[in-house]
Amino acid sequence: MAAGARALVPSPFIVVVFLLLAAAARDASALTRHDFPEGFVFGAGTSAFQVEGAAAEDGRKPSIWDTFTHQGYSPGGAIADVSADQYHHYKEDVKLMYDMGLDAYRFSIAWPRLIPDGRGEINPKGLEYYNNLIDELIMHGIQPHVTIYHFDLPQALQDEYGGILSPRFIEDYTAYAEVCFKNFGDRVKHWVTVNEPNIEPIGGYDAGVQPPRRCSYPFGTNCTGGDSSTEPYIVAHHLLLAHASAVSIYRQKYQAIQGGQIGITLLGWWYEPYTDAVADAAAAIRMNEFHIGWFMNPLVHGDYPPVMRSRVGARLPSITASDSEKIRGSFDFIGINHYFVIFVQSSDANHDQKLRDYYVDAGVQENGGGGFDKEHYQLHPWALGKMLHHLKLKYGNPPVMIHENGDADSPETPGKIDYDDDFRSDFLQSYLEVLHLSIRNGSNTRGYFVWSLLDGFEFLSGYGNRFGLCCVDFTAPARTRYVRSSARWYSDFLNGGELRPVKPFVAL
């Protein structure tokens, strides 16, 4: 790492956070779930494509992720046709949740299972499955927290008009969301419209490493077409409008009767300057605006961040006055999926180049942080504290649900099940301590969900990383589940046990 890097000269804020964490760690044995606010929700999550399986059963048709994986683009050639096979094992999984003591289960509805062609006829078998899953959860006292769209766009809509790139997506998505409200809203009280709309446009339409594989040189190669300088912004705009449209329908027709809440879930990487240089500090601020502000600014203020307006220019879609009115305040809570910090340096020298994409527009270059250190995520729990502090100060302290937080390891040796994952318990405890401290300091966070309940297909790594509190034996036809030690640790905490002291960790 270069001289002057953050690892050598931490900011005063980080020093304070680290000292507070050290003090908290000394008293970690006193922290229980009852130290969190009354009504605080603890859970775990998955998504349909990642664990459901039954890809071609009971009327389900392909999503863009089915097409992508079957064309061999997923790491290791992984496909999710069976995955954890929750479609056939949901009762077993609900029993695992119940035994663990979860308050809630976050899952998604597969659009191509419920409405296989993306619009029109509802699949009765899909309707039956989700009704059964929801009823099973409620029977066991577990809240269903449901995501309406989690990346699995019906391939039929992609083929017909280009999917999210077309404004026609907004109408079809809204109709699909209303089917969900109408059929499940009497029991589902927590809705998420869209999962991570601030990353899907980058993976699918800038770098082209995810479906539908659209990009342009030099930002991506081997794509089926696309324009990395414009399409990510168009896709994000359509996702934002679709979200607002669904919320509008819910509030007009269903919320008062059904008594639920609705929000959106953003990927919450935290960007930190790589050095103490003024330019790097400015780069980190810009990147957080491009990453979180891309959606939070319209949701709170009705328009994209000024820094994006000035740097992206005419390539950033306009928000009309009527759309601004619909978007502003279109949430009852904000979901955040947080895993790590990313250190950035300024690369503003490239900003005037003719070929530009999202990262060139932001004027940053990533230089460490995010991702895996050897086998596991680097441990930077202070980054979650910074994210929550940022949401509190900049966006009016909205209600927040931590919808994903967790750590992964590599697959077990074939034929051997490894129950010992203390690294995961240590990771989760470190973040829970920071979360508790943030709440004490005024953060309006109301829930925390571990990613994930089960091992499953991961969008970035196939089956190369395992996030599950519960292991799934993918070599067994029955997809046998095994409870890992982290599940027992979480269960002990959820049932009133004290957080055990964790191994000392370095905050930077």
UniProtKB/Swiss-Prot annotation:
GO biological process terms held by the UniProt record: carbohydrate metabolic process
UniProt keyword list: Disulfide bond, Glycoprotein, Glycosidase, Hydrolase, Signal
Positions of glycan attachment: 222, 441
Catalytic function, reaction form: Hydrolysis of terminal, non-reducing beta-D-glucosyl residues with release of beta-D-glucose
Binding locations of a beta-D-glucoside: 50, 150, 195-196, 339, 404, 451, 458-459, 467
Similarity comment text for this entry: Belongs to the glycosyl hydrolase 1 family.
The protein's name in its UniProt record: Beta-glucosidase 32
Organism: Oryza sativa subsp. japonica
Gene: BGLU32
